[in-house]
Amino acid sequence: MRELVSEAEVVAASGDDDLVVWAAQGMRSGVRAWACGDAVAVASPEASRRDRLVVRGTASQVVALVRHALAECGPSYRPLGDAQLIERVVEAAPELELAGHFSWMGTEKLAPPRGEATSPGMTGTGVTGLEGAASWLADSAAPEVAALLAAANPGSYAVPGLPRVRRWAGVRDGSGGLLAVAADAWSAPTVGLLAGVATAAPARGRGLGERVCRFVASALIAEHGRAALMVDDWNRAAVGVYERLGFARRRVAAAGLPA
């Protein structure tokens, strides 16, 4: 077992796995990582509002890394990785329990908009439509964003004012009302994270969520090289939007020590 001390070491040990590299967060202060054989574990504090222990590799070696990382970093860290791997880890480590399944989705290139030709200039500078372009919102829009999230996505991990929730984009109606939002939040140097997606209930079904997500994802790819997100498996409508945008789905699971 060896400790990894740089992002380059994490990239090499993980084969540039986007989930693992995202968790490394550029090896910012507080992040720790280890490798054992083909297994890698990255302990990332407050990554999308959770202390996450992202893992990959052979289950037996991952179990050893998980136990070491939990001893080093504390019981708040939740192992996260491919669903089958986490299920095997829980079977082999009876002190852990399965916390839930969801999906990680990522892409390096967006699919062309439906019914439109690919636009080489579409790199986060605006996506037009009847309700207006998706665009970055001023900091002064934070109360509007918070109100829309409270009504349309109260479980959102990204909310205005949280550390590393960097910026918000939105779509407004003709009178200036905010209809849809999405955030650039907890992004890593080479993996941008899309979060905080919400559309006002009366405006749903008009493609506004897809529009604002395309805008943010395009900007993330331009800046970081790839974009990713987390989505609940039950939210089939959201999964469909992300797949239309060109995101590939990866089923993951989380585990943890009993409270």
Protein language model annotation of sequence segments:
Residues 157-198:
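A conserved beta-strand-loop-helix scaffold within acyl/acetyltransferase catalytic domains
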